[in-house]
Amino acid sequence: MCKSDLHDFLHGLPKCEHHVHLEGCLAPDLIFELAKRNNVSLPNEPAYESIEALSHRYGHFTSLDDFLRFYFIGMSVLHHESDFADLAWAYFQKAHADGVHHAEVFFDPQVHRDRGIPYETIVSGFVAGCQRAERELGLTTRLILCFVRHLPVDNAARVYQEALDQEHFDNEVVHGLGWSSTEVGPPKDMFRELYSSASAKGIRLTAHAGEEGDPSYISAALELGAQRIDHGIRLVEDPVLMEKVVRDRIMLTVCPISNLQLRCVESIAHVPIRKFLDAGVMFSINSDDPAYFGGYILDNYCAVQEAFQLTVDEWRVIAENSIKGSWIGEERKTELLKRIDDHVQRHVAAV
């Protein structure tokens, strides 16, 4: 719970989450549970001696790549459709409790496929979790297939082709493509051909850029057709590019606690929330990999409020822009915008 007088307002504010990796919702207790269920041996090192030791280690990441090592080890416990469904359901319950009404979630099939897990097992499990969230919690959900930059392009191409062969984009089992993992090092345009193919088919595109990499990584992602930028905090270093992002209504999916935990910023106050608001940059606030970074979406909202002391009107702008930048139909957008307006009006009437 944040210390701000606006905590109850922030808790009840209808939220959209656009930047959360389902594999990043593998809490230590679930990792140990699934490892036991699936007879998976975890590494013989101090961090994996207990749930408590792993939780402690998660609070001391030194970089993006340090985090990614633990992230990919965690994935190794996921074997069966029910494992993926349980993981998704665990996230959606927490998101719902934090006031999320719509969630667009990443999944990383390449890493699982390299472990011998069939693509269909992965997708079927996550779809089951999404359907349960829609049925029992009233959330709307979208799955975004996420390429990883530390694996070869032909590896991503095989997964992309599987999704096409199963018509997952046409029948909206999968609603878009993204990329993530190591930012600095691999070629900025490594997915050029895949993004060109997807763009020609009308598939929605997003990309992790401008987290550790400089603004040129954002420019490269936009040039390849990205319609959203995940992270994007280094956009402020290029005023001309920032003007373009504002003009073209490109939404950033900002993850404040993640940026802090991975040492991208020295404090939440260094995340350019105020600069984005003043410049008119569209952005949403998200949790990224909440089980690893110790904060789900409400924790991120509270951290931003404690750092910036935003007004109700500023939060309204953030919430409304998060809806406008969502990959949902106009009817659902109108419904969610109405919920925000109702919530704001109730708050104003009560103070």
Curated annotation (Swiss-Prot):
Name the site position(s) for Important for catalytic activity.
H231
Transmembrane region(s): none
MF term (GO), any: adenine deaminase activity
EC numbers: 3.5.4.2
Q: How is the cofactor bound?
A: Binds 1 zinc ion per subunit.
Q: What Pfam families does the record tag this protein with?
A: A_deaminase
The chemistry this enzyme catalyses reads: adenine + H2O + H(+) = hypoxanthine + NH4(+)
Q: List the PROSITE patterns.
A: A_DEAMINASE
Q: Name one GO cellular component term.
A: cytosol
List the active site.
Answer: E211
* Localization terms from the record: Cytoplasm; Nucleus
GO biological process per UniProt: adenine catabolic process; hypoxanthine salvage; nucleotide metabolic process; purine ribonucleoside monophosphate biosynthetic process
- What SUPFAM superfamilies does the record point to? Metallo-dependent hydrolases
Binding, substrate? D289
Which class of enzymes does this protein belong to? Answer: hydrolase
Cofactor requirements of the protein = Zn(2+)
Q: Which UniProt keywords apply?
A: Cytoplasm, Hydrolase, Metal-binding, Nucleotide metabolism, Nucleus, Zinc
Q: Where does Zn(2+) bind?
A: H19, H21, H208, D288
- Look up the domain of life of the source: Eukaryota
**What does the record give as the function of this protein?**
Catalyzes the hydrolytic deamination of adenine to hypoxanthine. Plays an important role in the purine salvage pathway and in nitrogen catabolism.
Protein family according to the UniProt entry:
Belongs to the metallo-dependent hydrolases superfamily. Adenosine and AMP deaminases family. Adenine deaminase type 2 subfamily.
Alphabetical list of PANTHER family matching this protein:
ADENINE DEAMINASE
| UniProt-recorded name of the protein | Adenine deaminase
Q: Which organism is it from?
A: Aspergillus oryzae (strain ATCC 42149 / RIB 40)
